[in-house]
Amino acid sequence: MQFNISDIIKILPHSYPFLLVDRVIECDPGKSIKAIKNVTFNEPFFIGHFPGHPIMPGVLIIESLAQASAICVLGKETIENKVVYLRSIENAKFRKPVTPGDTLILQANIQSVCLGVHKFRCIASVSEEKVAEATISAVLQNK
């Protein structure tokens, strides 16, 4: 399954400037997802992070992975009156900086689902090089 930005804005509650997934290139709902965040110099966070040496903040890379994970849980058929909330982030590692012009590939695979908590193994990469990784847990709840 693939989703364009029109699909994504129907699935996620986020909006500019905090919508951090541009396209889904592969999704097996409830199992795995591969998505894209195009990183441009026009991102508002580059104003202060860092002047003259722009780097995407690590927390926003993690947020991008969390948003991709939420799409994986919800799928294209958004569950009415439900939302996915971030529950925990474990073992986050940042390996290389992400800079303007990069295409950030976001991958999340569900490791387990227990009592409504979805646990994902997530990897962010640029040009097939791992730039960040984390284990993210999220819960599907009523709005």
UniProtKB/Swiss-Prot annotation:
<dbReference type="GO" id="GO:0016020">
    <property type="term" value="C:membrane"/>
</dbReference>
<keyword id="KW-0444">Lipid biosynthesis</keyword>
<dbReference type="Pfam" id="PF07977">
    <property type="entry name" value="FabA"/>
</dbReference>
<dbReference type="InterPro" id="IPR013114">
    <property type="entry name" value="FabA_FabZ"/>
</dbReference>
<dbReference type="InterPro" id="IPR029069">
    <property type="entry name" value="HotDog_dom_sf"/>
</dbReference>
<dbReference type="GO" id="GO:0019171">
    <property type="term" value="F:(3R)-hydroxyacyl-[acyl-carrier-protein] dehydratase activity"/>
</dbReference>
<feature type="active site">
    <location>
        <position position="49"/>
    </location>
</feature>
<keyword id="KW-0443">Lipid metabolism</keyword>
<keyword id="KW-0441">Lipid A biosynthesis</keyword>
<comment type="similarity">
    <text>Belongs to the thioester dehydratase family. FabZ subfamily.</text>
</comment>
<keyword id="KW-0963">Cytoplasm</keyword>
<dbReference type="GO" id="GO:0006633">
    <property type="term" value="P:fatty acid biosynthetic process"/>
</dbReference>
<comment type="function">
    <text>Involved in unsaturated fatty acids biosynthesis. Catalyzes the dehydration of short chain beta-hydroxyacyl-ACPs and long chain saturated and unsaturated beta-hydroxyacyl-ACPs.</text>
</comment>
<dbReference type="GO" id="GO:0009245">
    <property type="term" value="P:lipid A biosynthetic process"/>
</dbReference>
<dbReference type="InterPro" id="IPR010084">
    <property type="entry name" value="FabZ"/>
</dbReference>
<dbReference type="GO" id="GO:0005737">
    <property type="term" value="C:cytoplasm"/>
</dbReference>
<protein>
    <recommendedName>
        <fullName>3-hydroxyacyl-[acyl-carrier-protein] dehydratase FabZ</fullName>
        <ecNumber>4.2.1.59</ecNumber>
    </recommendedName>
</protein>
<keyword id="KW-0456">Lyase</keyword>
